[in-house]
């Protein structure tokens, strides 16, 4: 099958360009001295066998991070980034992930704890591996690169050639496997990154002299005995050889056969002729210590192009490609990192072939530049990863300090904005929290519409859709419509016997002014009828007789909505109650933007100091908002006889805003354990009246320690899609991880950590 001709003659270039990529990344958990951790896999990440993202490999200390299959390099790295962050956040504070393939410090054999699994076969299998190969070689970590050619492309080729699509898949993937084994030496040259190991690693006493490119991919890595030779000349021969070794008990199972190419798509290789090879797992790659997640996005792209070019080009000799490729790969793996590649001419031809393919497929010019970058590395060995590692070793005299330093840096970077998931920082924080907790608990996540904050969650065959962090199928359609309309909210609650403020609904300034005479010097609140974000609200706690101030407040509210409410102001303190599935999970006191004097600094300086809190930012990508020094703040200070240059006495409080919204710089203070239970029950009843599973209830309460009566509270409003991050990361008090409660609501049969 001349695939290149078929593609060009039938205009399949675009379909051929579509692939699916997945990454599996192993890594050892270490302590800050570089010693491998002896702790068990983090309990909050259990059960590992049910988590598709975070598992363990051979050793209990060897964490394995697995991405979902993605359509492009950017997305697969994004998912890997997210999983990496989740893993680091849930590891003990003094643990890190070693960034190189081979640990700098290998523990005593007896101290290496084999991964703990539930299935007896998994335990038996690992005990067998220990007995046959020893523990040290299996402590080596790497990257597995999963690659699938688009099914539509395969079907088109099948239709054009009048061939069964399963046969097309098997033929193309078998060719790809042979080609990869033949030319993988180039990838070993470029990405080899395990140039040395301590003496105890070499259990039989034999070791290479000096530095090499890749111990992991050489005979010193985790390889089968020399008498295990499996042919890739055809799928039938591959199956015959592999099943024969298992039958003769030279291998305990098919998966004991270790090759840089593994076929995926069936439980056993014997099923591949009928089911077809679905994708190939390339197990060749060392960890790149200079990449925070073990591999760079540009290298995921280069490997993609390299693999695709192997399908594009014709085969040399499929009978000898495997043996020749093995020889080439071994020679490169054991060559010195600063040595010129002995197959330079062939390497340059491969790269030229890649560039020609890029042009013929009309791929981006950036791909040409990337290939040329690798061309430079081919003719200058000092630019390769292995050479850079050796330079670091020679500079430090040890790889230990270098590796630990990087491990600490990568964890510090991942935890710097600990309240967010950096790979998804374009999404709102509540959605990020749900994604993070879903990954932690092994619930599959698919971002359907990033701009609209829409995600798909799946666990145990159950699919749920979530918008904006907590809008789900559990709520009725009418519920948010009731809460959006403050007049309807008040009427519904009033009918149910809840205390709500009296007032008027108006739609113009003239209408409002007609009510002014009745409202002079009465405590009132002026606010939009249908807003959910605290915008356009003015509070006159002591009333006003100034018609200009009254008019300004009315116009401010009318900016946010065509209809506004003028309500009585109920005396007391406002609290936000977060209700989910008939239970109040969090209670928050929101304090207006303020600073506390120290007798030394001006108000402006105190604001600057307070804004240094990492939780403060734009309140979109941070849980809290930085306090501003604008006209509104200036007027608020003026009412208190203060200005930005005032130096407050120690303990003196200055308020820069009247309203307590987080979006205007307010403080969030957790009060869940301080509030009398009667108010929590009241909030649940209000949520039920709104027919809401998730609801933010705002109550004015005179004294939270005294039980609720009809006279000591008032309902300000009920909110759909209530903000979660101010509860999860409050300015002061205990964190309430409400995103976990959302997952518990959606997946009641699954244990959520």
Tell where the protein language model's regions lie, with residue ranges.
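Loop-rich catalytic cores of soluble enzymes, especially ATP-dependent carboxylate-amine ligases
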Residues: 5-10, 105-106, 116-135, 139, ...
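Active-site nucleotide/adenylate-binding loops and adjacent lid/helix of ATP-dependent enzymes
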Residues: 464-628, 677-680
């Amino acid at each position: 099958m001349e695939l290149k001709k078929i593609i060009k003659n039938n205009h399949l270039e675009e379909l051929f360009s579509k692939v699916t990529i997945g990454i599996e990344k192993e890594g050892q958990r270490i302590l800050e001295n570089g010693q491998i951790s002896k702790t068990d896999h983090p309990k909050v990440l259990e059960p590992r066998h049910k988590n598709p993202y975070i598992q363990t490999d051979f050793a209990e200390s060897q964490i394995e991070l697995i991405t979902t299959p993605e359509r492009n390099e950017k997305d697969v790295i994004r998912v890997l980034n997210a999983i990496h962050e989740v893993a680091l956040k849930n590891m003990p504070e003094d643990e890190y992930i070693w960034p190189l393939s081979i640990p700098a410090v290998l523990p005593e054999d007896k101290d290496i704890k084999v991964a703990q699994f539930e299935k007896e076969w998994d335990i038996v299998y690992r005990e067998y591996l220990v007995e046959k190969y020893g523990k040290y070689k299996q402590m080596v970590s790497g990257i597995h690169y999963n690659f699938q050619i688009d099914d539509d492309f395969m079907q088109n080729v099948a239709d054009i050639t009048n061939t069964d699509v399963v046969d097309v898949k098997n033929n193309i993937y078998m060719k790809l496997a042979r080609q990869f084994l033949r030319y993988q030496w180039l990838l070993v040259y470029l990405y080899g990154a395990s140039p040395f190991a301590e003496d105890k690693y070499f259990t039989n006493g034999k070791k290479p002299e000096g530095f090499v490119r890749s111990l992991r991919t050489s005979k010193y890595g985790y390889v089968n005995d020399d008498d295990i030779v499996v042919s890739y000349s055809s799928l039938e021969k591959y199956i015959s050889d592999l099943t024969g070794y298992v039958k003769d008990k030279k291998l305990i199972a098919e998966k004991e056969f270790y090759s840089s190419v593994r076929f995926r798509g069936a439980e056993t290789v014997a099923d591949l002729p009928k089911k077809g090879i679905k994708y190939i797992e390339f197990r060749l790659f060392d960890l790149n210590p200079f990449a925070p997640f073990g591999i760079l996005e540009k290298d995921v792209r280069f490997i993609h192009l390299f693999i695709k070019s192997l399908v594009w080009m014709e085969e040399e000799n499929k009978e000898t490609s495997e043996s020749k490729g093995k020889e080439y790969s071994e020679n490169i793996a054991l060559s010195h990192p600063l040595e010129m590649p002995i197959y330079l001419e062939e390497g340059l031809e491969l790269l030229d072939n890649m560039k020609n393919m890029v042009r013929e497929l009309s791929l981006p010019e950036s791909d040409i530049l990337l290939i040329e970058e690798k061309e430079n590395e081919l003719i200058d060995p000092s630019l390769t990863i292995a050479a850079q590692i050796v330079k670091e070793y020679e500079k430090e005299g040890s790889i230990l300090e270098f590796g630990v330093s990087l491990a600490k840096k990568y964890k510090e970077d991942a935890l710097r904005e600990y309240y967010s998931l950096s790979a998804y920082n374009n999404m709102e924080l509540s959605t990020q929290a749900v994604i993070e907790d879903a990954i932690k608990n092994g619930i599959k996540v698919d971002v359907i519409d990033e701009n609209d904050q829409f995600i798909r969650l799946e666990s145990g065959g159950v699919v749920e859709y979530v918008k904006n962090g907590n809008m789900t199928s559990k709520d009725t359609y009418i519920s948010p419509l009731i809460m959006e309309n403050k007049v309807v909210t008040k009427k519904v609650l009033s009918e149910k016997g809840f205390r709500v403020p009296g007032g008027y609904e108006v739609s113009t300034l003239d209408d409002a002014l007609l009510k002014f005479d009745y409202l002079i010097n009465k405590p009132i609140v002026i606010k939009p009828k249908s807003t959910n974000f605290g915008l356009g609200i003015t509070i006159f706690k002591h009333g006003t007789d100034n018609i200009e101030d009254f008019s300004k407040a009315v116009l401010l509210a009318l900016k946010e909505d065509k209809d506004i409410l003028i309500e009585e102001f109920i005396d007391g303190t406002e609290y936000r109650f977060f209700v989910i599935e008939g239970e109040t999970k969090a209670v928050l006191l929101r304090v207006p933007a303020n600073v506390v004097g120290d007798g030394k600094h001006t108000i402006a300086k105190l604001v600057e100091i307070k804004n240094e809190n990492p939780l403060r930012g734009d309140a979109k990508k941070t849980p809290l908002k930085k306090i501003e020094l604008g006209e509104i703040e200036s007027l608020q200070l003026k009412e208190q006889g203060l200005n930005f240059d005032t130096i407050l006495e120690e303990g003196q409080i200055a308020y820069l805003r009247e309203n307590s919204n987080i979006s205007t710089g307010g403080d969030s203070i957790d009060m869940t354990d301080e509030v009398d239970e009667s108010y929590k029950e009241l909030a649940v009843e209000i949520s039920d009246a709104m027919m809401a599973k998730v609801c933010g209830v705002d109550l004015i309460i005179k004294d939270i320690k005294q039980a609720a009566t009809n006279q000591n509270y008032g309902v300000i409003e009920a909110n759909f899609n209530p903000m979660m991050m101010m509860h999860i990361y409050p300015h002061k008090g205990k964190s309430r991880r409400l995103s976990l409660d959302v997952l518990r609501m959606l997946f009641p049969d699954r244990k959520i950590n």
